[in-house]
Amino acid sequence: MGVPSFFRWLSRKYPKIISPVLEEPQQLVDGVALPIDYAGPNPNGELDNLYLDMNGIVHPCSHPENKPPPETEDDMLLAVFEYTNRVLNMARPRKVLVIAVDGVAPRAKMNQQRSRRFRSARDAEIENEAREEIMRQKEQLGQIIDDSVKNKKTWDSNAITPGTPFMDKLAIALRYWTAFKLATDPGWKNLQVIISDATVPGEGEHKIMNFIRSQRADPEYNPNTTHCIYGLDADLIFLGLATHEPHFKILREDVFAQDNRKRNNVKDTIDMTDEEKDLIRKQDSEKPFLWLHISVLREYLSAELWTPKLPFPFDLERAIDDWVFMCFFCGNDFLPHLPCLDVRENSIDILLDIWKSILPRLKTYMTCDGKLNLESVEMVLKELGNREGDIFKTRHIQEIRKKEANERRKQQKQQNVSTGQDRHPTKFNEQLQMYDTNGSLAKGSWNLTTSDMVRYKKELMLANEGDENSIKIIEEVSERNNSLMKEIQSEMTPEDYKGNNNNFTAAELLKKKLNARKRELEKEKENEEQERASKQPKISETPDESDLTEEIEADVIAEVEDETTPDEKDTDSIITEVPEISNGGITSGVIDTDEAVKLFEPGYHDRYYIEKFHIEPNQIPALSKHMVKCYIEGVSWVLMYYYQGCASWTWYYPYHYAPLAEDFVDFHDLDIKFELGEPFLPYEQLMSVLPAASGHNLPEVFRPLMSSEDSEIIDFYPTEFPIDMNGKKMSWQGIALLPFIDETRLLTATRNQYKFLSEDEKRRNTRNDPVLLISNKNVNYEKFAKRLYKKGHEDNFQLVFHHFKSSLAGIVSTDTEGFKLHAKLPCPIQSGALPELSTNLFLKMQYKLLPLPSANKSLILNGFIPSEPMLTQHDFDSIVYKYGTRGFQRNQRNFGMEMKQNIVPVGPSGTTQYKPRIGGYRSFFYFGQLNQQMHQHNQVYQQNQAPTHDRYRNDRSDRGGRGYGRPDHDRGDYRGDYRGDGYRGGHRGGYRGGSRSRGPSSRGISSRGYSGPSRYNR
């Protein structure tokens, strides 16, 4: 999920990062659509590697939002095949396809999965109730409904979790479909397909990241490989940047193009005709897609992140890593975002402004290869804490202005004269309910006054979405109004109706009297409270005026001291132990703790912790300090997860809320360490994240643990739980306040049941390796078949292969599922009408990644050839000098611009490439030679007026020789004077430079040498 609204914000701020996908139309012959020629040239430009985050395909295919879902699981799998085939025809990878399905996630992610799945089960229950009500209404109208339709339940989307029968069926189906394409599609003959199903631990996108890091570690890796990843998650953008593979792009649906489409509810999908279903299928097949070009985003960021007057060389790669890290505070899948940060409010720009103002005072960047410099992080967060109060006030003012603007628009709309399409104009402050001719409230309506609607606005919204607790609240208010209405009606006489000079109807007259009566009751209640308050004794009643003055002065002084020296008050009563927190006795319903916190008013700090954690004021320091420690551990874990892989499978953030920014102080000396641990088994994760309502996805032996009152872990599966809206408007944005899982108790109870599992159930509860499938036309086919499957092969033999021959590296071994040559592979889908396949047409093997020789380095590899720049000098200047509209409303979704025929070309744009060196990492040796010139360049900024920022000059020198990232100021393209052979024309000069090189690339750095320090060789 990542950062909400991040893609929308990013594409508006940097409009040239996106371009439309060009799809080749299918040819019709006698009404039959011919398949697209996969082997033909790609109108979007050629691509080497494609990575599919399959959960982003499986979810919309199995439970679509805007149309009836597939009838059976087989139909769902066929829909997955159809969608995947369309994506592949758009991207057309030529070398490698990685299909990654979410496996068991780290514990840090399970908390979010648990919240989603509990809410998903509740939403499914509401949808089933709505479906049953619709069926009852139809039967009351005399319609005959088949039992199969009437008893149909909403398919449980929680089945898309590792370990369920559906995920097992999906894995088998994906392996068959891949083999079918390799055996029958000529365009796939050289494609190598890696399938990492749900039995392989790890999230899909992070298994893809592990694969890319492994390929980069191979000595023969081509640094000019083009990559593309498909998916809708915002964190794919961060992952693309974190690879430091500039030839990278993201393929995704154009969700903005679908914003205006009608949203069908349950009733719409039930009543949908076959013609309407066909129309929706046609619309879905024409949904537009977008490219998001990481290379163009890097160009924008080179201008956005460029900072003068640095005491150290500007390093674009590390600056990008800092930018990615700052985005984590605005939202991620593992930690709650900081209360003062929201992407919609340009919070990333706020953090960037702080970073650029502080960077010259820092000794180095905040991040380095996935590790944090806590001193630098503390300085940035401390400055954010100083601005926090102003951010809350600004947000409140903007909300008020937005609300007032909406009210004005609403009022203007209601006062319009009807043109035949508008409803009858009504007064702004009148919202009458439905009444019959006798003045009684019509059946099915809520009797609410205007003040009730304002007071219970949030409950009304949630009630309309089916929330039971909100419905109860609204019904109670309505019942009170009904009682008052009956009381008023009994008191009215015929003269009251006759004296009606304004010709009100009976319903209108009763409504007005109800409003008046409620105002009287509220006034009486207010007077009673004032009277009680006046009878209470004063705090300081004394006849002596001087004593009174002294007491008032003492109170004022004490109040000032409380406000100015909060850390010194009641030091003896402050509790240093971390307090136990609770939900304040709230076990269900929808709440909004932000209403009581009032972040925009003074004193919000203490109110925040008291209202959300239900603790005493003297417990706040201990709690906030522990939360800060856990949160810093969390962002350290997330950064390592993105750049090095999972640092710990068992760590998680133990709170539902984030600390306030002003509490991030004195954490620079934290000693952050993680224990790797091991991932849960699939059934253990299912027991951690599924509610009892989804227990049918588990083997039967586990279900009593989730539903029986005698279960030792029954408290992990509440049927009712509170949801804190936390100041948000939409119900899905609320926080489900579920209890955190006790790992020891859960694993003990779960593992005690393993002995009762069947063999098939045990098979689904294992950890496996990915599989590699190739066609019999692949360059490695004969070698792999001979060593692994033909007569005389060694048992348990592992074959290591490298990148040079097939553009893929790894370790293969015999398939554990019993693949054999000269056999048949049947289709696992009954209704698919797909044939049996001969196993001589393809090869299936177990696949393992090459082990990394060392920690991954956040650098561009040797031999990289830059792409042609996409941005003009005007684009760069608009970023650097902040003119125009600060990056927004410029060229929004302007696909009229020429995007180099929609293709971002991959070098050579100039005549040079990176200089290779032993070790495979460039480490900015070239810029190391220019340290002296860099310092002179900084002195120009300090002593004279700053020179014009020239794109990737990186505040080095302005001499003529320019390398990568140093465009010609006059021509606006990349030029460079340093030469290197690296990976060009098949030479092995990649990751390890001279260690296994051929030809002149083996020179490494010896032909040039270098001067000055490198951060990896000191």
Curated annotation (Swiss-Prot):
Function (record text) = Possesses 5'->3' exoribonuclease activity. Required for the processing of nuclear mRNA and rRNA precursors. May promote the termination of transcription by RNA polymerase II. Essential for vegetative cell growth and chromosome segregation.
The record's GO molecular-function terms, alphabetically, read: 5'-3' RNA exonuclease activity; rRNA binding
Renumbered to this chain, the Basic and acidic residues biased-composition regions fall at 519-534, 948-984
> What CDD domains has UniProt attached to this entry?
PIN_XRN1-2-like
EC no. given is 3.1.13.-
GO biological process per UniProt: cleavage in ITS2 between 5.8S rRNA and LSU-rRNA of tricistronic rRNA transcript (SSU-rRNA, 5.8S rRNA, LSU-rRNA); mRNA splicing, via spliceosome; NAD-cap decapping; negative regulation of transcription elongation by RNA polymerase II; nuclear mRNA surveillance; nuclear polyadenylation-dependent rRNA catabolic process; positive regulation of termination of RNA polymerase II transcription; sno(s)RNA processing
A Pfam cross-reference name: XRN_N
Q: What protein is this chain from?
A: 5'-3' exoribonuclease 2
Which residue ranges have biased composition labelled Low complexity? 997-1018
Q: Which InterPro entries match?
A: 5_3_exoribonuclease, Xrn1_helical, Xrn1_N, Xrn2/3/4
Name the protein family. Belongs to the 5'-3' exonuclease family. XRN2/RAT1 subfamily.
Q: What is its main location?
A: nucleus
Subcellular location(s) of the protein: Nucleus
Superkingdom as given in the UniProt entry = Eukaryota
Q: Which GO terms describe its cellular component?
A: Las1 complex; RNA polymerase II termination complex
Region entry Disordered, spans: 402-424, 519-549, 939-1018
Q: Which organism is it from?
A: Candida glabrata (strain ATCC 2001 / BCRC 20586 / JCM 3761 / NBRC 0622 / NRRL Y-65 / CBS 138) (Yeast)
The lineage, from the top, is:
Eukaryota, Fungi, Dikarya, Ascomycota, Saccharomycotina
